[in-house]
């Protein structure tokens, strides 16, 4: 068991504390992230500035996650999966060294269409929404990449 303060690669954004000057110096939050991966992005930017992400052993943080105003389960699944994948694409696109991983996910686009079809036939509607959300995230990210070129 580890004890004492240690340097870590990433930490949960809900538990981060910065001096205001340092937070401004790293460029604040990237507004292109919906909610996911913003903490990973902050940690990456901290390391780029030759600073450290330190986990303080004695610290305690309670993060009440999972509280959502969206009551419709299908809408909740769609929003979670769609924005999770979009944020994941954005994070890996920014980090440059994950191009192969991004390509593998984008290549799954046609597989998602097949899975949507079979999930419809078997009446697994939550899966239909799940795969549709991921499919639309891929389409949206492809449009984003086209605008950049």
PLM regions and their residue ranges:
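A short, conserved alpha-helix in the catalytic core of glycosyltransferases
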Residues: 4, 9-28, 32-60
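Active-site-adjacent helix/loop segment of glycosyltransferases
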Residues: 44, 48, 52-130
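Membrane-interface aromatic/basic loop that binds lipid-linked glycans or pyrophosphate carriers
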Residues: 122-149
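Membrane-proximal envelope and lipid/glycan-remodeling enzymes
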Residues: 26-31, 52-54, 70, 77-83, ...
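Intrinsically disordered, low-complexity regions
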Residues: 4-5, 16, 74, 110-114, ...
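Residue-level signal for well-ordered alpha-helical scaffold segments within enzymatic catalytic domains
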Residues: 21, 25, 45, 90, ...
């Amino acid at each position: 068991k580890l004890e004492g303060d240690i340097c870590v690669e990433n930490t949960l954004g809900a538990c981060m504390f910065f001096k205001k000057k340092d937070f401004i110096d790293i460029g604040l939050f990237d507004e292109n992230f919906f909610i996911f991966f913003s903490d990973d992005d902050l940690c990456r930017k901290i390391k780029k500035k030759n600073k450290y992400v330190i986990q303080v052993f004695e610290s305690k943080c309670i993060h009440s996650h999972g509280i959502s105003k969206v009551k419709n389960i299908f809408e909740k699944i769609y929003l979670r999966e769609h924005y999770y994948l979009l944020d994941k694409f954005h994070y890996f696109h920014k980090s440059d060294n994950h191009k192969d991983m991004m390509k593998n996910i984008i290549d799954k686009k046609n597989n998602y269409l097949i899975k949507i079809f079979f999930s419809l036939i078997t009446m697994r509607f939550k899966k239909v929404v799940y795969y549709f959300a991921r499919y639309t995230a891929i389409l949206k990210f492809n449009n984003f990449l086209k605008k950049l070129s």
